[in-house]
Amino acid sequence: MLDANLKTQLKAYLEKVSQPFEIVASLDDSDKSRELLGLLQDIVGLTDKITLKTDGSDARKPSFSLNRPGADIGLRFAGIPMGHEFTSLVLALLQVGGHPSKLDADVIEQVKGIEGTFEFETYFSLSCQNCPDVVQALNLMAVLNPNIRHVAIDGALFQDEVEARQIMSVPSIYLNGEVFGQGRMGVEEILAKIDTGAAARDAEKLTARDAFDVLVVGGGPAGAAAAIYAARKGIRTGVAAERFGGQVLDTMAIENFISVQETEGPKLARALEEHVRHYEVDIMNLQRASKLVPAKNAGELHEVRFESGGSLKAKTLILATGARWREMGVPGEQEYKAKGVCFCPHCDGPLFKGKRVAVIGGGNSGVEAAIDLAGIVAHVTLLEFDSKLRADAVLQRKLYSLPNVEVITSALTSEVKGDGQKVTGLVYKDRNSEEFKSIELEGIFVQIGLLPNTEWLKGSVELSPRGEIIVDARGETSLPGIFAAGDVTTVPYKQIVIAVGEGAKASLSAFDHLIRTSAPE
């Protein structure tokens, strides 16, 4: 199951296991059970600290639990955790085996203090880059607190459950049999939902912080670069972000970040955060900005208010809140989001195996999505508003070579149809004939560009007609002492490498502003 190179790497990791435990597998006579058995035998063959039993009686087969004598740990994988979930498996082995987590001590204590009964189930796909964060967070919580149980379920292997629960997006998380959430979540986000008093406590702590010399709002590539450049100047630096990594977390293959030949979004996001944490930067996650209150007079502090109820003050600000997927804005879209309307073909594509889907958008992202999906689904219809596709020629050639793809141009998507539970089709207007036409399908993947996260800034800094923050050559906004960088600004070409450079530039400009405004007259 594991090649020699992977065995060597895993053996080195398993040397960190300090407490013996057992793997209990529940198997049947299927090929997948035999495949899982091979994986588990490979694992126990690398260390004498782990033993394997194959007499498990769990209803989900193939599956396995990790059990440590003397500890009540409710952690199970249903399926074969390879692909993106192999890291989740390795971390689970280490944590059940007594290796400490890198999670902040305060968060660990908060997890340990949770009371009640929490039976979590997470449905994932092996190609989903967002799923491991959820799986790893809940696995760790299950290791730390016996009141928390978690099963990570490969939706592709348990299609009957996926169909019964009408799951059309991963990760999908259930708590005690009810829908808990969808999409990427970390430990702190999960805690915020189950520990109802945490939000108020965190807001108080946030507001109590001293003012920063530079406060970066946003934790994507631009925000990370800005924080590093500021911290290296020896000034008090903070980063307040809804999620560190930003939109990079939702990006699959990255092959144009100079000096890194190939990587994946979550991996790059982790590297960015590790680099920032190397310096004295106060990182405040799960903070979504709600209002900017600029300083009224020179020498006063700017204030940023957050949806959590907390606020922060700073001498200078760098706004790097990035952008999000643009939605179609048509009837039915919100109702059927995550019920057939999706934005991540890598994550959710496997759930539509053998089904019919549409991709909305004929740029590079739309055409790449259609190409990826064509290898999984029965049929792909790509709809483009313009009279021609806008993707690179090499991508278009690949697209048109696929037998199960239809391209419709001059098409305005006008409605998402459904049966109250899931998507059943869409309606589009032929812009040439003005005729409305219907397509029967099960999934819609929206790939029509980005929308800047600037709603909270209206009435403060100057915005372009597209809602982007207008900046000058130094990254400064229309308000002195407030700078901006990355996809949220008017700087053209929304690329990671450009965002990093713009973040560094904005930070240098902010430092220059601090020097000039604090210099004695």
UniProtKB/Swiss-Prot annotation:
GO terms for biological process: cell redox homeostasis; response to reactive oxygen species. Its EC number is 1.8.1.-. Binds 1 FAD per subunit. Serves to protect the cell against DNA damage by alkyl hydroperoxides. It can use either NADH or NADPH as electron donor for direct reduction of redox dyes or of alkyl hydroperoxides when combined with the AhpC protein. NCBIfam families: AhpF. The active site is a redox-active disulfide bond. This is Alkyl hydroperoxide reductase subunit F. The lineage of its organism: Bacteria, Pseudomonadati, Pseudomonadota, Gammaproteobacteria, Pseudomonadales. The gene is ahpF.
